[in-house]
Amino acid sequence: MFIDEVRILVKAGDGGNGCLAFRREKFVPRGGPSGGDGGRGGDVTLVCSEHANTLLQFRFNPEHKAERGRHGEGSQRTGAEGRSIDVAVPVGTVVYDEATGERLYDFTVPGERFVVARGGRGGRGNQHFATPTHQAPTEHEPGRPGEEKRLRLELKLLADVGLVGFPNAGKSTLISRISAAKPKIAAYPFTTLEPNLGVVQMEGFRSFVVADIPGIIEGAHEGHGLGIQFLRHIERTRLLAHLVDVSEESGRDPVQDFEIIMQELARFSDQLVAKPMIVVATKMDVAQDPARVEALRDLAKSRDLPFFEISSATGQGIDALKHAMADRVLAPVPVPE
């Protein structure tokens, strides 16, 4: 888990101005005041959406402004209200007022709504200022300004996809290839000493979070290697991507590596090993023995697990893998009616 944080500006619509007008009718040379009121400004509402996974979209669009109300008109006509806007945020987003530090709202359930900036009231037209002794008032009010706030949005990110596999199976290299994360990468075990998380951006501002879980070794469920604490990080992921080095450089058997990791997951938690999983053969650019790849493919097929071949160095298979992950963890985008 890590904290994603963005700062945004929200501005509700100003109210429309009240109108200064008088009745103009035939045979009524001195008609009374008829200025209508200004319309109310639109609100800015934050809406908790299951279709939002991260705060990435706010980095591209940090300002959100509702429409101002229309001005009042003669004949006591009130101006139209400004259009309000809804701004989607992910479940788990906490909203703070940047100026005061006050915690304004904590979104926990899809569909929750919070009006974060209210539109300004429309100004009164001159019809409201007439009295028995003041029958031709020229007073009229400007609209009230809509609320404007600078907000800090904070999201505790849980990974949608957990990358598991032996040390140096290529997890850190893959996450650096498909996201903006820059984990430490080197050719020795336990380069990754804590989970790295990266946000993977897809088309249409959709995104999901991938966690590069530190290398699991035999005995991890008992605390060996980097221990049990890192297995806990993948308990709440929606998909496991099991990376297996199929090159000869490792000096290891890909099938045996796969089986050992599966045993460690099962010993830690039955629910963990039952999670949706895909199998990813890594380092295909330096894999010289096709039999090693085929053996792993056959094993994945026997367990009814999708199988992918990639090279993070050359980009082979990366796009197909990204889309396969997205298809499994992102909710379908609703089609407008």
From Swiss-Prot:
HAMAP family: GTPase_Obg. Gene3D superfamilies: GTP1/OBG domain (2.70.210.12), P-loop containing nucleotide triphosphate hydrolases (3.40.50.300). Coiled coil: none annotated. Its EC number is 3.6.5.-. Keywords: Cytoplasm, GTP-binding, Hydrolase, Magnesium, Metal-binding, Nucleotide-binding. An essential GTPase which binds GTP, GDP and possibly (p)ppGpp with moderate affinity, with high nucleotide exchange rates and a fairly low GTP hydrolysis rate. Plays a role in control of the cell cycle, stress response, ribosome biogenesis and in those bacteria that undergo differentiation, in morphogenesis control. CDD domains: Obg. GO terms for biological process: ribosome biogenesis. It comes from the Bacteria. GO terms for molecular function: GTP binding; GTPase activity; magnesium ion binding. Its main location: cytoplasm. Residues 159-330 form the OBG-type G domain. GO terms for cellular component: cytoplasm. Mg(2+) binds at S172, T192. This is GTPase Obg. Pfam families: GTP1_OBG (PF01018), MMR_HSR1 (PF01926). Residues 1-158 form the Obg domain. It comes from Solibacter usitatus (strain Ellin6076). GTP binds at residues 165-172, 190-194, 212-215, 282-285, 311-313. It is found in: Cytoplasm. Residues 61-74, 137-146 have a biased composition (Basic and acidic residues). PROSITE patterns: G_OBG, GTP1_OBG, OBG.
